[in-house]
């Protein structure tokens, strides 16, 4: 059984833990840098990206998170987590973790009051997935090796690049665990490759 961490500084941590466990993996809430060494994959949950960055800096997580990405262990960023994984952010000088060759626009779907749900088709996951968008970012540009998994109204809302997955929406806020199960499979495959 693979062990998947959820960065536990802010955001929908409990919901991600439930989704991971429902998908047949062990979940760990990561609150200390040392825990990164014990896990096979990591979810960066939604929340407020500037607050999350402040907490990441306060608890000295940034360089260990970049090191985790360099080790090519799978990472999945949802909403604010997508912003953390992007290597370019519209209107900002500096990326955060910068593991994915994507350009992201923050709060692109509007503010909290503009939150909405949309039915999505997600490559590798299936049809009729309810995406919960809360002040959601979206991807405006990608490198050639980034795969677009889902679009909404002509905007890229789920992308994959190697061991990295990012979604504008919150898959953990529904009882449909297919997106989390997709990430669990990515982690299982990556772990098997390391063993071989």
UniProtKB/Swiss-Prot annotation:
Q: Which SUPFAM superfamilies match?
A: Class I glutamine amidotransferase-like
**Would you kindly state one Gene Ontology biological process term found in this protein's UniProt entry?**
glutamine catabolic process
One of the record's GO cellular component terms: glutaminase complex
Q: What is its EC number?
A: 4.3.3.6, 3.5.1.2
GO MF term list: glutaminase activity; pyridoxal 5'-phosphate synthase (glutamine hydrolysing) activity
List the InterPro entries.
Class_I_gatase-like (IPR029062), PdxT/SNO (IPR002161), PdxT/SNO_CS (IPR021196)
Query: Which CDD domains does its entry note?
Result: GATase1_PB
Which chemical reaction does it catalyze? aldehydo-D-ribose 5-phosphate + D-glyceraldehyde 3-phosphate + L-glutamine = pyridoxal 5'-phosphate + L-glutamate + phosphate + 3 H2O + H(+); L-glutamine + H2O = L-glutamate + NH4(+)
Q: Does the keyword Hydrolase apply?
A: yes
Key words, A-Z = Glutamine amidotransferase, Hydrolase, Lyase, Pyridoxal phosphate
Report which superkingdom the organism of origin falls in.
Answer: Bacteria
| Gene3D superfamilies membership | 3.40.50.880
Q: Does the keyword rRNA-binding apply?
A: no
- Active site, renumbered: 79, 170, 172
Please give the Pfam families that the UniProt record associates with this protein. Answer: SNO (PF01174)
What positions does the entry give for L-glutamine binding?
Answer: 47-49, 106, 134-135
Which pathway?
Answer: Cofactor biosynthesis; pyridoxal 5'-phosphate biosynthesis
Its biological purpose: Catalyzes the hydrolysis of glutamine to glutamate and ammonia as part of the biosynthesis of pyridoxal 5'-phosphate. The resulting ammonia molecule is channeled to the active site of PdxS.
Cited HAMAP family: PdxT
Q: How does it assemble?
A: In the presence of PdxS, forms a dodecamer of heterodimers. Only shows activity in the heterodimer.
Q: State the similarity comment.
A: Belongs to the glutaminase PdxT/SNO family.
This protein's name: Pyridoxal 5'-phosphate synthase subunit PdxT
Source species: Bacillus cytotoxicus (strain DSM 22905 / CIP 110041 / 391-98 / NVH 391-98)
Instruction: Name the gene.
Output: pdxT
């Amino acid at each position: 059984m693979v062990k998947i961490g959820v960065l536990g500084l802010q955001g929908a941590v409990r919901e991600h833990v439930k989704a991971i466990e429902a998908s047949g993996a062990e979940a760990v809430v990561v609150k200390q840098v040392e825990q990164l060494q014990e896990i096979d994959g990591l979810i960066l949950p939604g929340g407020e990206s500037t607050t999350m960055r402040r907490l990441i800096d306060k608890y000295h997580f940034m360089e260990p998170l970049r090191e985790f990405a360099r080790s090519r262990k799978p990472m999945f960023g949802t909403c604010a987590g997508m912003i953390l994984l992007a290597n370019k952010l519209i209107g900002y000088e500096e990326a955060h973790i910068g593991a994915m060759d994507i350009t992201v626009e923050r709060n692109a779907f509007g503010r909290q009051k503009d939150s909405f749900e949309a039915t999505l088709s997600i490559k590798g996951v299936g049809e009729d997935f309810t995406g919960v968008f809360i002040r959601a970012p979206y991807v405006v540009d990608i490198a050639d090796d980034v795969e677009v998994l889902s679009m909404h109204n002509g905007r890229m809302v789920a992308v994959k690049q190697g061991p990295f997955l990012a979604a504008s929406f919150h898959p953990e806020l529904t009882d449909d665990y297919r997106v989390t199960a997709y990430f669990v499979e990515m982690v299982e495959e990556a772990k098997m490759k390391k063993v071989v």
